[in-house]
UniProtKB/Swiss-Prot annotation:
Family indicated by similarity: Belongs to the CENP-N/CHL4 family.
InterPro entries documented for this protein: Chl4/mis15/CENP-N
SUBUNIT field: Component of the inner kinetochore constitutive centromere-associated network (CCAN) (also known as central kinetochore Sim4 complex in fission yeast), which is composed of at least cnl2, cnp3, cnp20, fta1, fta2, fta3, fta4, fta6, fta7, mal2, mhf1, mhf2, mis6, mis15, mis17, sim4 and wip1. Interacts with mis6 and mis17.
Nucleus found in the keyword field: yes
UniProt name for this protein: Inner kinetochore subunit mis15
Organism of provenance: Schizosaccharomyces pombe (strain 972 / ATCC 24843) (Fission yeast)
Gene that encodes the chain: mis15
Superkingdom: Eukaryota
Gene3D superfamilies (alphabetical): 3.10.20.720
GO CC annotations on file: condensed chromosome, centromeric region; kinetochore; Mis6-Sim4 complex; nucleus
Predominant place of localization: nucleus
Keywords: Cell cycle, Cell division, Chromosome, Mitosis, Nucleus
Function text: Component of the kinetochore, a multiprotein complex that assembles on centromeric DNA and attaches chromosomes to spindle microtubules, mediating chromosome segregation and sister chromatid segregation during meiosis and mitosis. Component of the inner kinetochore constitutive centromere-associated network (CCAN), which serves as a structural platform for outer kinetochore assembly. Has a role in the formation and/or maintenance of specialized chromatin at the centromere.
Length: 409
């Protein structure tokens, strides 16, 4: 049996396919049907069954129907026609792959994307051409899985999508049924970049573990010593990744350096000591007096353009030693206490923010004078370009471990 499946294999209709079709706008579906029929990429398969009991031969003309769909016809009626009359034997495997990629690219279906960076100790390693990458990946998958691949280019962003469906090569059952979500992998290769976008890998899943091994071997074949390391960024918005980690990434808040130069930000969040800068009194006065002009300037400098940084979840772990050894008297007292353990005096505080657009929400809160844009730490303004952060004594630390499973609720 061939390990790579053809795109012309038919998948039986079920509720998942109908649910996927319902995500699309009416006109978008009609346009797709016309394209499938005219280009004969996924032609109607109703000819394989007897249609005499359902439609007359004159009535069954899919191309003429989809070119002139009555305006009064509802989307559900069009979907019914697709499933019952034109593709009654099931959609093709490539047809479903195209639908899923289009739904993700146009935002009809949302999915949490994350990213990993190709790390090499000696030099930067850029991912190869997507077609070359796919062929190398196929060679790694052949001995382990029965698989299907689909590659497509995003219409506006510099991203090439690769969709993979994996089955166990020893037990390739249910090839004609809609695959489980655990069997489907989405990859996104950005142009001239060393960052790989992908869906979130699940912990303790054999299929996901084997797929990660295939990716690791592929990178080693490209350049010995290369490995994937996770980037702590999770978002449903692909533009966010192009802005933060792509080759066209933007310096989102360059004006913030005017504030950093005053030493007003990135201090410990629990530090109660006064700011000792001599020339920052005017900025603090403007902040406390709610000076709208200076506040708005600070907000724009700190947040930049948040429209290209859409985050729906922000997870921050704060690690801080609240015992300050500022005086000799304090040091003597602490040395005399035998039970004192510095590691026990570091509380971990996990802060999680959720919403449709977190950064825009924080920006509005600053405008309402509920937060101070002058002293707000950088991990709350999007300047770090991350959505999962570990902050130790006010400093954002990045993970250095190799790629592993990342299951995020």
């Amino acid at each position: 049996m061939r390990t790579e499946l053809s795109s012309n294999i038919r998948i039986k209709h079920d509720k998942k396919i109908q649910k996927l079709l319902n995500r699309f706008p009416r006109d978008f579906l009609v346009k797709l049907c016309v394209e499938w029929i005219q280009k004969q990429t996924y032609p109607p398969n109703a000819k394989d069954i007897n249609l005499e009991d359902m439609l007359d031969d004159e009535e069954w003309n899919p191309e003429a129907f989809y070119k002139n769909v009555p305006k009064s016809m509802l989307k559900r009626s069009i979907i019914h026609r697709m499933l019952v009359y034109d593709w009654p034997n099931g959609f093709y495997l490539g047809q479903i792959a195209q639908l899923e990629i289009l739904a993700l690219a146009h935002g009809f279906v949302s999915m949490r994307w994350t990213a990993s960076k190709v790390h090499h100790s000696a030099e930067k390693t850029v991912l190869p051409n997507p077609l070359v990458f796919l062929e190398l990946l196929k060679s790694e998958l052949e001995s382990i899985f029965v698989y299907h691949t689909y590659i497509s280019r995003h219409e506006t962003l510099p991203i090439t999508f690769i969709r993979l469906v994996l089955w166990d090569s020893k037990r390739p059952t249910a090839l004609h049924t809609y695959p489980s979500s655990k069997q489907i992998f989405y990859l996104g290769l950005m142009d001239d970049s060393d960052v790989l976008l992908h869906n979130i890998f699940l912990r303790n899943d054999v299929c996901h573990s084997l797929f990660l091994q295939c990716l690791s071997r592929l990178l080693y074949r490209l350049k010995a010593g290369s490995a994937l390391r996770p980037i702590d960024l999770v978002s449903k918005n692909l533009t966010t990744f192009c802005t933060n980690v792509g080759v066209n990434k933007e310096a989102n808040a360059l004006g913030a350096w005017q504030i950093y130069a005053k030493n007003l930000v990135d201090r410990s969040p629990l530090d109660t000591r006064p700011i000792l800068s001599d020339d920052n009194s005017s900025l603090i006065a403007d902040s406390t007096q709610n000076c709208e002009k200076h506040r708005e300037m600070a907000i724009q400098r700190r947040f930049g353009d948040t429209h290209s940084q859409v985050l729906d979840k922000l997870l921050i772990t704060l690690d801080h030693d609240y015992i300050e050894k500022s005086t000799e008297k304090d040091k003597v007292l602490e040395e005399n206490v035998e039970s004192y353990n510095p590691t026990e005096q570091r509380p971990l505080v996990v802060m999680q923010l959720r919403g449709q657009h977190i950064l825009e929400g924080l920006k509005d809160i600053c405008r309402q004078d509920a937060l101070d844009p002058f002293t707000m730490p950088s991990y709350l303004t999007g300047e770090t370009g991350l959505s999962i952060l570990y902050v130790r004594d006010g400093l954002v630390l990045q993970r250095q471990e190799s790629l592993g499973q990342q299951e995020i609720n």
